[in-house]
């Protein structure tokens, strides 16, 4: 039975891969659907699984309550060992939930997880983009699907922490650096004029 399930999933993956390799639009659509299928189960229902997740969520909650978006605090203790950006993203996510009328938004843990889910999805799409610097569309889709199917990224997508968003920024920098590196090896006749987009992404 297990072997049949593996065979079925392999067949689905192969069909999705072949369909996605036809165009960039299809690739992005398939990767998003595949990644959501990997990340969404349990996203809204799981209780905090990591000891740090409640600390991140509580610090972001206090940030909203005090309206102090500079000094990060967990209860009465300063929490300056993590980038402030993740707290801003979590606070923004909860604020959007409040504006949409979500009941008890500040105590709804999955709202604090939305930046991590978004970061994980971005990491998958950026892996596809980064791989296109080296390989054709088909292998690039496969690389992104492999990342989406990893257990660790699936776990991080469910946690209100920094790692999924950090991964997305790292993959973006790697993709930009790869393109700049490949351009540096071209002759002057082949190389395009240096633009501002890749350095900005890096």
Regions flagged by a language model, labelled:
Residues 2-202:
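Membrane-integral, polyisoprenol-dependent glycosyltransferases
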């Amino acid at each position: 039975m297990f072997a049949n399930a593996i065979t079925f999933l392999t067949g689905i993956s192969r069909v999705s891969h072949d369909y996605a390799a036809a165009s960039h639009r299809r690739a992005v659509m398939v990767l998003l659907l595949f990644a959501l299928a990997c990340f969404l189960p349990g996203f809204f229902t799981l209780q905090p699984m990591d000891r740090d997740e409640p600390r991140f969520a509580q610090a972001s909650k206090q940030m909203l309550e005090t309206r102090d978006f500079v000094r990060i605090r967990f209860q009465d203790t300063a929490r300056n060992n993590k980038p402030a950006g993740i707290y801003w993203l979590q606070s923004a996510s909860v604020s959007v939930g409040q504006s949409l009328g979500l009941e008890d938004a500040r105590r709804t843990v999955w709202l604090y997880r939305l930046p991590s889910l978004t970061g994980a999805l971005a990491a998958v799409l950026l892996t596809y983009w980064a791989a296109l610097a080296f390989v054709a569309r088909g292998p690039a889709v496969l690389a992104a699907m492999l990342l989406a199917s990893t257990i660790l990224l699936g776990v991080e997508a469910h946690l209100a922490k920094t790692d999924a968003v950090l991964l997305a920024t790292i993959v973006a920098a790697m993709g930009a650096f790869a393109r700049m590196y490949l351009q540096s090896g071209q002759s002057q006749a082949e190389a395009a004029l240096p633009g501002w987009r890749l350095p900005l992404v890096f």
